Amino acid sequence: MANESLLLTIAVLGGTGKEGKGLAYRWAKAGYRVLIGSRSSEKAVTTASEIMQLLEGSSSVVGTTNLEAAGQADIVVVTVPYSAHRETLESVKDALKGKLLVDTTVPLMPPKVSKVHVPAAGSAAQEAREIVGDDVEVVAAFQNVSHKHLLEEEEVDCDVLVTGTSKTARSEVLKLVEAAGLTGWDAGAIENSIVVEGLTSVLININKQYGSKHAGIKITGASQSS
């Protein structure tokens, strides 16, 4: 993992947000070169500096625009709200050709965020696939992980379900899940992302009903040991 991380650059679009910042921190800590992308390069530079301070300058984290980040990266991760999903992807799609796109977006529709919303494409990930085209492998992951856990050193009590356009692409993202200190599961084709995205609204509802803040999911009855 360490050798591979030194060879790859990850762009986190919308990386100034809580989810993006947390993932960027985890990957930078694991040794990846990380680019923080944002519509505002100034905000991206500030967030990158904050992450570098947390890591005591031991990793490479750089802030720039979404387009610049996408163009320089090997793997591009989208961590924007659903309201900015299409606009963000449209703005960088030419820079994504031949690359791996990881979509963390959940199609939440405020104020009814505890109710599952199904986009016309079936899911946010399938919508992303329609926007970026067949030259881009699209994988959906990290939708159910609370951002709060990502900036903490303690173990994250939530598994990651990974769906995507090919098994090879899903395998690559499972490596990123592991690098972030999480447990990932190959959950199959990208069409299955509709279920994974919907679970986020279910978890939000559970948080409200039971007074919790960071409900997550765990896969039981299966083993990853070889």
Predicted regions and their residues:
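NAD(P)+-binding Rossmann beta1-loop-alpha1 motif at the extreme N-terminus of oxidoreductases
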Residues: 2-53
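Short beta->alpha connector loops
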Residues: 81-84, 144-145, 166-167
